[in-house]
Every structure is written in C-alpha cells, then in structure tokens.
Curated annotation (Swiss-Prot):
Organism from which the protein derives: Zea mays
Stated name of the protein: CASP-like protein 2A1
UniProt xrefs under Pfam families: CASP_dom
Quaternary context: Homodimer and heterodimers.
Topological domain ranges for the Extracellular compartment: 63-83, 135-166
Protein keywords: Cell membrane, Membrane, Transmembrane, Transmembrane helix
Annotated family: Belongs to the Casparian strip membrane proteins (CASP) family.
Source lineage: Eukaryota, Viridiplantae, Streptophyta, Embryophyta, Tracheophyta
Amino acid sequence: MSKMAEEKAAAVGGLGGAGAADAAQQQQLAAGEAAAARVRPVETLLRAAPLGLCVAAMTVMLRNQQSNEYGAVAYSDLGGFKYLVYANGLCAAYSLVSAFYTAVPRPATVSRSWLVFLLDQVFTYLILAAGAAAAELLYLAYNGDKEVTWSEACGVFGSFCRQARTSVAITFGTVLCFILLSLISSYRLFSAYEAPPSSALGSKGVEIAAYPR
C-alpha cells in the first residue's frame, strides 16, 4: 500500500509541476507580447525607412547617364550598377511587405520569428553585396588599375561618377537599416530559447572528456 501511495503522490506532484511550468510559460509569452506591442511602432518605422532609401538610390542610378565628345555611358553598361538597381528594387518591396507585417498585431510564434529572421538575413546580405560591388566599380572608375592598364574614367565622365557615388552612399544607408533589423529579429528569435537548467549538467558540473594518448 505504501508503494502505491508513493506512486500516486509522485504522479500528483508531477502534474502540479507541469501545471506550474505551463503557467510560467504563459506568463512569459504574455510578457513577450506586451514588450512586442511597445516596440512595434518603432520597428514598423524602422522597416519602412529602407523603402524610401531604396527608391531614392534606385531612382538616382536609373537616371544616371552622360554623353560628351568622348562618348556616352549609362548605368546599364555596367553589371555592378544594374545589380544595385535590382537589389534596391527587391529590398524596397520587402521593406514594404515587412512593415505591413510588423504593423499588424499577431501572436508571436517561433516559426514566425524564424521566418522574419531568415528573410532579414537574406536581404541584408543582398543589399550589402550590391553596395560592395558598386563601390568597387566606383573605385576603379576613379583610380583605374595599372596592373591591367585600366585608366580612370571619372575625369571624363564626372557627372556620371558623382551620381553613382550618391546612389552607392544611399545604398549603404539602407545596409545600416537592414543590419539593425537583423539584430532586432535575431534578438527576438533567440530570446525565445531558454538556457538549459544547471541541474541538466549533473551534480558534478561539466565533465571534460579525456582522450587516450
């Protein structure tokens, strides 16, 4: 009889512990949703900011062309500048969609946090790569490359280079915005995971494996 009583008491204790854990988890979710509601307006504005920057950078580059007695040049003649235009267009669309997505209150879930985190990472690296490629083209246009006998071109097409430089500078402003968004989404995602309790390490603490020599 005593053994059965002990088993019943253990079962009741286990149910009580599970109920307490569920209650604690619900409180944690409620606190997280309250914090998200306070941060939502700021994050929405931050997600909308790259939209204007991307459109500005794209517009400046699309209008970038120059012709004189030495010839004519346009952004479409250079693959790096075309990539910059495409990347800014994609990032502008993502900025608009993500701003609307963030502005609408919805329950926070781990799957949604993972989705936003991954998309933020993809578009951050996309716009960073576009800015870096365009910046390298600008460097060659201003300085040339003696090793491959490329002469600088900005002395002849100064207006073209200035407009390209403006577009690249705006693009790197977009990069900074996306880096901040990536930090926010990564914090939101990984703060949902708790560190393992110290009891999981065992009474002896962390054991270091010894390999035979």
